[in-house]
Amino acid sequence: MKLLLRLTEEFVEANSPYLNAQQVDWVCRYCLRVVETYAKSGRGAVKSEAGALLSQEAVKEAYKEVRALLRMLTHMSSGNLHDAIIESAPPDQAAALAEQIDIARVVFAGLNAVIPLITDELLKFPKLCRQYFELLAYMLEAYPKKVAQLAPDLFGTLMSTLEFGLKHADETVSKESMTALGALATFQCNSAKTQTIGLGAHMAPNAEGVSILAHLMRLLFHRLVYEEAVFNLVDEAADALLPIILHERPAFQNLASAFISAVADEPRSVDLLQNAFVALTSANGLAEGVDRVNKRRFRRNLADFLTVARGVLRTR
């Protein structure tokens, strides 16, 4: 199976720019069969039926297979196959053919097979970890509605891996995770404006009474305030936090209150934090919206906020 995955991945990478629409359709059907066969095989899991961790050798084998599958899905979603359809089809048929040959369906079938296999054990492999979060960020940006339609268990696993990525020390993994979160939050924020379903039941409150977006907002704020080397993450973090704050106002206010209460015995610090939180959501002409101009404004606001908040909270 590992050899089949490797050959398929290499074939898609090498040939996708040179195919015509009919050949792209064939490749998609073939890759879907590979994904379905792999999913049915039960391979790639890093735990035995008894729940004990497998040997390091078995973990490495699972890593190689899952990474090959991720690479195949990444090549499929890169745009080369879509471009091949558009460029080879008659102009009046290109759009219809691109919709008919559902590349996203294959990629999401692959994600459905991969997500249950992505554990902390496999994410310890740097190359696989980066590959997974790069693909996740792309799919959440390009197809958030399809992500919202995932079964609850798959969506929950995906969110667990996203939380892992948001806390990861690797800068690339952190940035891709924040990009993925920003795409998901923007989808939910825009859905609320248009009164469409958005993430639907996936937004149900957890045991602490907060939604998944509010939970990840709190996690990200804590990382930005308390951990080292965060200013190189400000742009991606800001793009993720802005739509969450706009959609989760009460949760954001509760978060601000929690930070301020941590310095309640220092009136000067309370004033500094209160003013910083006000400026975060109002300075530089910040408006309601997640357009490009507003994102740039919020990036500046977040950088200024962190300068104050880290100075106040990290000295205690």
Where are these regions (language model features)?
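Karyopherin-beta/Importin-beta family HEAT-repeat alpha-solenoid scaffold
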Residues: 1-316
